Amino acid sequence: MHDLFIYGTLMPGLRLEAEMHGAERLGPARVPGRLVDVGHYPGLLHGEGTVTGEVYRVSDAQLARLDEVEEMVPGDRPASQYWREQVTVLEGALAGQPVWTYVYNQPVDGLTPIAHGDYRRYIREVGRDS
């Protein structure tokens, strides 16, 4: 089993929530980093700030499926839209523990920062569906 931090369209009530079917929700959390608006989903980047999301426990098979959803090509970082990395939870579920998350792995020039790091709040503010 793997602990995974999600922060965008995989969260409950958002567009890709069905991809999390069968995963165990551990609760809300915050991790270090910053968010950008990639178009119809966010991208987490390394940097100052915090990102709001949720932690789930997933099986090996679920994690492999989520790698596909996030367009992560194992062993080929340059070809991957996101890259799965470990981060340490700052607050909330599993605080102080390492968890997997998907870090955006493409150029970010021209992308809009999501300064507060909360994708749910952001889509409400800009009036966008997930």
For each feature predicted by the language model, list its residue ranges.
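Glycine-aromatic micro-motifs
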Residues: 1-130
